[in-house]
Amino acid sequence: MKTSMTLGGIGPRLALLCLPYVILSVIVMVRYPEFFDLRFFDSSFIKVLGYVWLGLGMTFWIFSGIFFLKYFKAGKLITLGPFALCRNPIYSSIIVFIIPSLALIFHSGLIFSISLVLYIGFKISIHGESRLLRRAFGDEYNIYEKSVNEIVPFPRYLFRGKSVK
């Protein structure tokens, strides 16, 4: 059992879990482009929406990565910036923004399914990391965990009518 956090987090495990499906999906998309084609998404409006979503996702990913690299080595719980919106903003940017935006742009159900598989892999893999964070930061992490979404970058307090302190 791991006893300390690593810079890669659950990334390597998530890659091992999901990479075979991603590779298979890409092969199927290249060989049979009509397979799981979502024709009802084949419009200019949806494509533009996909590009906007992709821009948001790439911005969120870059900002999250820079923020993480800047503050990880300090050994403190990161709760500001993108980490104030969700506990796993780097994975969020990929699973919630980047891959779904590509699915919209290419009107592909297979690309959407990659996002779903990554989310399932994320849910399977994240528990060990959460345990390490609970052990390392105690009540501070428990409070953070209860006040910030795991992967959807949307402030919970907007629905509760009170701010997070």
Predicted regions located by residue number:
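Membrane-anchoring alpha-helices and their flanking helix-loop junctions
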Residues: 1-79, 94-165
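Short, amphipathic, aromatic/basic-enriched membrane-interface segments that mark the entry/exit
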Residues: 78-89
